């Protein structure tokens, strides 16, 4: 049973996100979505808000980014009655993969997807918990494109607007939807 999104405000989700100062390092205000996931009411609200947005968009598959994108994406795929594809950190998938690197603050990382995960022309929704600099999301989008998928949209719960990730994603040609926007995760 879907909860109509007007039944509760998106602001209620924002209130449920826990803020933790100086984690994972000094100067960062971490936004922890686990309280949303722990609450049946708020987890349902989160998924239902996304279901209502995408239920008429003819999505073939939902892809989720490691790791919180798995939780949201799999629940959303289930409700949309489509398959789910994990995009994992490099070295975690057992079958043949394609990889995409992205920049970190100090260095580089990579994500991978199975080569048979997205069929040519499939309409794909990419999901993660948040968008900061956009590096992971951009890498995921590039993987989907490499496999011939069509990006319906990239979606996240939260976007840190001051870090320009959303702007970078949109500049790549992918539409981006976020339920919440915040000025940033830098403390003080």
Curated annotation (Swiss-Prot):
What's the short name of a Pfam family annotated to this entry? Pribosyltran
Pathway in which the depicted protein is active: Purine metabolism; AMP biosynthesis via salvage pathway; AMP from adenine: step 1/1
Describe the reaction catalysed, as an equation. Answer: AMP + diphosphate = 5-phospho-alpha-D-ribose 1-diphosphate + adenine
Q: Does the keyword Oxidoreductase apply?
A: no
* Alphabetically ordered keywords of this record: Cytoplasm, Glycosyltransferase, Purine salvage, Transferase
Its subcellular locations are: Cytoplasm
GO molecular function terms here? adenine binding; adenine phosphoribosyltransferase activity; AMP binding
Q: What is its main location?
A: cytoplasm
- State which Enzyme Commission number(s) the record gives: 2.4.2.7
Question: Do you know which CDD domains this protein is assigned to?
Answer: PRTases_typeI (cd06223)
Of the GO CC terms on this record, one is: cytoplasm
Q: Origin, by domain of life?
A: Bacteria
**Which is a GO BP term held by this UniProt record?**
AMP salvage
Tell me, in a sentence or two, what this protein's role is.
Answer: Catalyzes a salvage reaction resulting in the formation of AMP, that is energically less costly than de novo synthesis.
Subunit structure, as described in the record: Homodimer.
Q: What family does the database annotate?
A: Belongs to the purine/pyrimidine phosphoribosyltransferase family.
Q: What protein name applies here?
A: Adenine phosphoribosyltransferase
Instruction: Identify the gene encoding this protein.
Output: apt
């Amino acid at each position: 049973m879907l909860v109509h999104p007007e039944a509760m405000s998106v602001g209620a989700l924002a209130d449920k996100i826990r803020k933790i100062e100086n984690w994972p390092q000094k100067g960062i205000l971490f936004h922890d979505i686990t309280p949303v996931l722990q609450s049946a009411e708020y987890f349902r609200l989160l998924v239902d808000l996304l279901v209502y947005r995408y239920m008429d968009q003819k999505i073939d598959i939902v892809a989720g980014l490691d790791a919180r994108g798995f939780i949201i994406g799999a629940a959303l795929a289930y409700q949309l009655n489509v398959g789910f594809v994990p995009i994992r950190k490099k070295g975690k998938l057992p079958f043949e993969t394609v990889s995409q690197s992205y920049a970190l603050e100090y260095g580089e990382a990579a994500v991978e997807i199975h080569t048979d995960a997205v069929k040519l022309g499939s309409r794909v929704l990419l999901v993660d918990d948040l968008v900061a600099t956009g590096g992971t999301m951009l890498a995921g989008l590039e993987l989907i494109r490499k496999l011939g998928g069509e990006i319906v949209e990239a979606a996240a719960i939260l976007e840190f607007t001051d870090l320009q990730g959303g702007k970078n994603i949109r500049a790549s040609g992918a539409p981006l939807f976020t339920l919440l926007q915040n000025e940033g995760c830098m403390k003080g």
